[in-house]
A protein has these predicted regions:
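...with weaker cross-activation on analogous glycine-rich loops/strands in unrelated enzymes
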Residues: 147-222
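Active-site or metal-binding loop neighborhoods of secreted/extracellular toxin and effector enzymes
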Residues: 212-244
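Residue-level detection of beta-strand scaffold positions
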Residues: 22, 88, 125, 181, ...
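N-terminal capping segments
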Residues: 89-149, 197
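Residues that flank catalytic or metal-binding motifs in active/ligand-binding sites
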Residues: 32, 77, 178, 198-200, ...
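Hydrophobic beta-strand residues in large extracellular and virion-surface proteins
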Residues: 98, 102, 137, 141, ...
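Extracellular adhesion/carbohydrate-binding repeat motifs centered on closely spaced tryptophans
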Residues: 1-94
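A mature extracytoplasmic/lumenal domain signature
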Residues: 19, 40, 64, 85, ...
C-alpha cells in the first residue's frame, strides 16, 4: 500500500505513491506541511523538532497532521506560529510583533483612525461615537494576525467594554508592560458623563521608571504619548495573551 497507512500502536505514516518508500521528516503532502517521525509516525499537536542545533516547536493538526500557522488557540492559550515556517514564537517575539505593528501606525491621520471604527462595525462590533482610540488598538492586533490575543478576540470600539471584559477575565493589572493596553479615565470626560468605566485606550511601546510611552489615536491622528504611572487618569492595563 501507499499514502497514509496505519501501522498499529497509534502510528500513522506515509508511503510514497511512486516508490512505495516510507517518508520521514518534513514533507509537503496534500497541500500541507507535515512532520513524520520514523518511529512514532505522523506528528500531531504541539511538537518539538530539533533543527540546526536548536529546538523549535510546531503545531500539527490533531486530526490530519497538517501544519498550522498564525495565531492558534492551543492547550487553553493563544500562541503565534510563524506564517512562513510554522515555528512557534516565544512570548518575547509575540510582544515584539505587536510593537512592530503598533509603531507602523505611528503618524497615521485622523481619517485613517476613523476608518478603523468602520472596520470594527464591518466585523460586527458597535461604533463608538466618541473617537477611534479602541478601534485603533483592535485594528493593530488584527493587522498583526493576533486578534485572539486581545480579550480572546472580542470585537468592539468602546474602551470601557474591553476594560470591563478584561477585568472580568482576569486580564488586567496595575503594572504597565510593553504590548499591554493602557486604559484611561479623564476628569470631566464622556465616560464620567455617561457612566462607564473608561474613555480612552492606547498600546504601550516602552516602559521606564515611573512612566510609560504609548501609541494611539488622539486628536490629530495616531501619535506617541508619555504618561506617568502614578497619574490619576490610570485605571490599569489590559493584559494580552502573551503575558498569560
Amino acid at each position: 500500500g501507499y499514502g497514509f497507512l496505519y501501522l498499529g500502536d497509534n502510528v500513522v505514516s506515509y508511503f510514497d505513491p511512486i516508490t512505495g518508500s516510507q517518508l520521514t521528516g518534513k514533507q509537503f503532502i496534500h497541500g500541507s506541511w507535515r512532520n513524520i517521525d520514523e518511529q512514532t509516525g505522523l506528528n500531531c499537536g504541539l511538537t518539538e523538532v530539533s533543527e540546526s542545533g536548536k529546538t523549535n516547536t510546531y503545531y500539527y493538526d490533531n486530526y490530519d497532521g497538517g501544519l498550522h500557522t498564525g495565531q492558534q488557540y492551543v492547550n487553553n492559550s493563544w500562541h503565534f506560529f510563524d506564517e512562513d515556517t510554522g515555528r512557534m514564537y516565544t512570548r518575547d517575539e509575540e510582544v515584539r510583533r505587536i510593537v512592530q505593528f503598533t509603531l507602523a501606525e505611528l503618524g497615521g491621520s485622523e481619517s485613517t483612525a476613523f476608518g478603523y471604527l468602520e472596520e470594527v462595525r464591518a466585523d460586527g462590533g458597535s461604533y463608538c461615537g466618541y473617537g477611534p482610540c479602541m478601534a485603533t488598538v483592535r485594528h493593530i492586533f488584527k493587522a498583526a494576525g493576533m486578534s485572539g490575543f486581545l480579550a480572546d478576540g472580542f470585537v468592539d470600539s468602546w474602551p470601557h467594554k474591553y476594560l470591563d471584559l478584561m477585568i472580568e477575565k482576569g486580564q488586567h493589572t496595575m503594572t504597565p508592560r510593553v504590548g499591554m493596553v493602557a486604559f484611561f479615565l479623564w476628569e470631566n470626560s464622556f465616560a464620567n458623563q455617561i457612566g462607564v468605566s473608561a474613555d480612552h485606550a492606547e498600546i504601550i511601546v516602552e516602559v521606564g521608571d515611573g512612566w510609560y510611552k504609548t501609541v494611539g489615536a488622539i486628536a490629530g491622528g495616531i501619535k506617541e504619548s508619555i504618561y506617568h504611572t502614578a497619574g490619576d487618569y490610570n485605571i490599569g492595563f489590559g493584559v494580552p495573551a502573551f503575558y498569560r
